Structures are given as C-alpha cells and as structure tokens.
Amino acid sequence: TTSASQEPSSSQAAEESKILTTAVGAELNTLYPLNMDVQNNIGTKLCYEGLVNYENGDIVPCLAESWEFSDDGTALTFHLKEGVTFHDGTPFNAEAVKTDFEFAHPNPNFSNISAVAKLESIEVVDEYTVTFHYPNAYFAYLMDFCYPETMVLVSPAVLEEGNYQSMNGVVGTGPYVYEEIVDGDYVRFVRNENYWGEQPYYDEVIVKYIPDASARLQALQSGEIDLIYGSALLTWDDYQQATSLPNIAGAVAE
C-alpha cells in the first residue's frame, strides 16, 4: 500500500534524492538470512541476492545464468554470472558460493536451514561453475534456491570475520547497500553504484521502526511513510480502509 505525494518540479527532482520510506513492526537488528524473521525480509531483498529468483510462477536466473540437473537427479549444477562483486569488493564466484553454503550447512544455531539441510556436498567445478550434490533425487531442489530466507549469498569475508549477524555485516551483491541504523528509529540503505544489474529507481530506502499497527497506518495516511508492505504489517480491514482514501493506492499479490 503506497501513499501518493505532490509531484516536484523538474528542477526540484534533479536536486533532490529519490527516497522511499517504509515501516516495519520489529527492529531490523540482523539481516543475516538464516536467522531473520519475516519483517526483516524487505531489508534482505534490498541487499542480498540468490542464484535464482521466482517470478510470476517461473524460476528465473539471478546470480546464476543457467543450470542443469544430472541424469539421476542427485546433482544440480549452476553456471554463475561473471563480473559480479559483493558490496565490500569480494569477487562473486564458485568458491564464494561454496563458502556460503558450507558455512550454513549444517548449523543448529540458524533457524532457517530446512532447504540447506538437504545438501550432501558442494563441488567447485571451475571459477564460475558449482555443483550441489544430494543423497537422492527430489523434485523441489531448484525451488529451494528461490527462498530469500535461506538461499541468498553473503560475502565470504564477512563470514570469516564473524560479524555476519550484525548490521555492519550486511554485505551482499544486491542493488542497495546498508548505510546506517538509528536504534529504535530507522535503518537506511543507499543505492549500490557498482551493482551488476539495472540501477534501482530510488537513491535511498529508509525502513522506519513503528511497532504499533495504527501508528503505521497513520504514518502512511499523513505521508510520513510511502509504503506498507506485507500482510504481517497490515490487516485486510486496514488495507481496505487505507485504499479507500484518494491519495493511497494498493495492490494484492495472488
């Protein structure tokens, strides 16, 4: 659900940063995918990416350009995109993928490991080719890689340093970079100028901490925030109330 605001003049638009402000009900104290909750999902999607995405019912390439299964269905090989770096300058390659998934599997300290737990081993074939081996064939192995809660890539340098659960350890390959946190108030992300893909529209994304649902809705109605995202943050009744107003538009995912 989004709030519309008055359009700036062309001269104003050239001078002002394009900023999107949204709100969540829980503080973003960690964005490490294997330990995050659903309300942290928006920050994870800004900063991290996986090998594949799920869009409109199809599995599509992201950091992997293509993939294939072995004849017996127990090995899944990904051919990786070249020339990608993490936010800290660490190269994205097959060794980085192997490091990431071996760090996560199996680790009882992480809450979101169901998809990772199925892995048997990971093989680096060459610099940009990696194979995941499984104990048996299973129809949903590729689908497992679509889940942002388990299958996005973190810089191996962050894993080695051990600060992957702090906000300073939010280092992925995504279109936005973590910039700052003000405890109890907001987290700010800025556009990744070295992003491998198309540059995002907004220069900055600010995620405010507003724990009360009524206060979040009032913030949307007043223009303090531009967006409320997800059923965990907005009831159906509140959605209907908000979208009945002339300055607020909404969309429902099927």
Feature names for model-found ranges:
Residues 65-109, 125, 131, 216-219:
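Aromatic- and charge-enriched surface segment that lines or borders ligand/interaction sites
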Residues 68, 114-157:
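Surface-exposed binding/hinge segments that line
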Residues 1-20, 58, 66, 103, ...:
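Short, low-complexity disordered leader/linker segments with a strong preference
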Residues 16-27, 65, 75-78, 97-100, ...:
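Short, well-ordered beta-strand elements
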Residues 28-35, 58-60, 140-143, 185-188, ...:
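Short, solvent-exposed loop/turn elements at domain surfaces
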